[in-house]
Amino acid sequence: YLSSLIDDHSRFILHSEFYDNKSASVVEDSFHKAILQFGKFDCGYTDNGKEYISTQLVKSCARLGIRLLRAKPRKGESKGKIEKFHRVVDRFIEEIRIAKVHTLEELNRLWKIFLDQDYQKEPHGGIRKYYESMDVSVPDGGISPLQEWNRDSRELIFIDTGVVGEAFMHHEDRTIDAAGCFSFDGFMYEASTSLAGAKVRIAYDPLDTSVITVNYQGMEPIRAKRVAISAHAQKKPPVPAAMTDTIPETSRFLDALEKRYNEENRMAADAISFGSYRKKEAAAHV
């Protein structure tokens, strides 16, 4: 399942990631990561599927001052920009059918490279149409989502990572047993024997429940770790079978994009290193 956030004007992708399930927590995770990387936005516009209208998502965004609007049922034209982006996803999946990909991690690694090197940097027809509709000339080479995003003069508003993290935390009540433990989602967690019999408030990230924060009045929060492995624990999920029905050795297109991606990162690292050297050189002559 692919979850994506797209900037309405520039068509720039704020976050896009494949997950092994289609749940509300996946959408929350996408919002969380997009806000951390690109800052707070004023308003979000989502589908009306149940995973997009969860109370938790609405509350999390409200805590950060973000208003959520929902598309009306059977109004496909209102989601046109993200639907057109899905055609790009289809192109990627065709390449993935060629590549030898077995894990979700590898799928997302290649997807990030594809986005950064192909979609974000390619001229976008929708941006051209937008400007031409207002009789504004567009360069012959067009304008890419990345270029249009960078042309926006509005200042990005970043929020402290701790504040954002807390906004997306889930909360539930639990009772601590005589051994100082509590159960959650089929696992046991160790809190403290001093809380035996107490009703506590737990806070957790639904996509990472290896550690859960336990809150009790008059005490510092406790980080409770999982102490038992449930029988239903699973390894990292594989890529959906539908994507890998044909698995040759590699995709030449994705290989080329990855090579360009690595080269750009290397050049950026060299530039930073050279800049640091120049500063040291200048300081040495002062």
What are these regions (language model features)?
Residues K22-S25, S30, D47, P73, ...:
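A short linear-motif detector with a strong N-terminal bias
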